[in-house]
Amino acid sequence: MEHRVPHKMPHTMLLHGLGQSSDSWKQVIDCLPTEQKEELHTPDLFALSEEISYEGLYRGWEQSCQKLPGRLHLCGLSLGAVLALDYTIRHPQRVESLVLIAGQYRSPKFLLSVQSLLFSLMPASNFAQLGISKEQMLRLNRSMIPLDLSRQLSTVRCPVLLLCGEQDKVNRKASEQMLHLLPNARKREVAGAAHEVNLQAPQQLAKELSAFWESLPKSSDL
């Protein structure tokens, strides 16, 4: 008699945004089916690197990915989406699927400049809960200004889900552009959410993630 082995999800990474922490995914995870939680990782990006810059965060997180076997499902919001896209470009053989929430592929320089100004006016205590200083946050923001992944988008061959809150006017344009620039992308809007979809619509986000992962072809780990 043949015994079927249940399909095992690849390791899945949920990457938080700027101003968030790994706890920002808790409500989303609570709404996911049990089988999709088995190999789930929510790294605290700021704890993975001693150098708080874009490249420092990327390298610290990249090293944690290299410790995991097989292929990966990557899902990131905002800063996390940029990191996930960058990793997929640099390591296409490692990525099974990609979810980009409120993502950008080219830094919006004006918005980053405004954000830096706002950060500079905030008290240092506002950054303590993230485990970084005010100066480190400003340095991180400045380090992202030159970022531009536009030339590499056509090399991303894995299935991609682009998610954007229906009220997130800032990132909607980038999502529309990526829909046409990424070869295997689909796009959905999350009702009732703006930028921080994982905090503003966790149940709806969990449904979108679960449906996307369920729709993927089942493949064995590398």
Go through the PLM ranges and name each one.
Residues K26-D30, E39-H73, K207:
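Active-site loop/oxyanion-hole signature of alpha/beta-hydrolase fold enzymes
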Residues T155-V156, L162-C164:
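Short beta-strand/loop motif that positions the catalytic acidic residue
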Residues A193-P202:
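Catalytic histidine-centered segment of alpha/beta-hydrolase-like enzymes
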Residues G76-G80, A84:
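Gly/Ala-rich beta-loop-alpha elbow adjacent to hydrolase catalytic centers
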Residues G17-Q20, S78:
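Active-site glycine-rich loops that stabilize anionic/oxyanionic intermediates
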Residues S125-R151, Q167:
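Hydrophobic, aromatic-rich cap/lid helix
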Residues G19-Q27:
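Serine-hydrolase catalytic-loop signature spanning alpha/beta hydrolases and amidase-signature enzymes
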Residues Y54, L85, I89-R90, L98-A124, ...:
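Flexible "cap/lid" loop of the alpha/beta hydrolase fold
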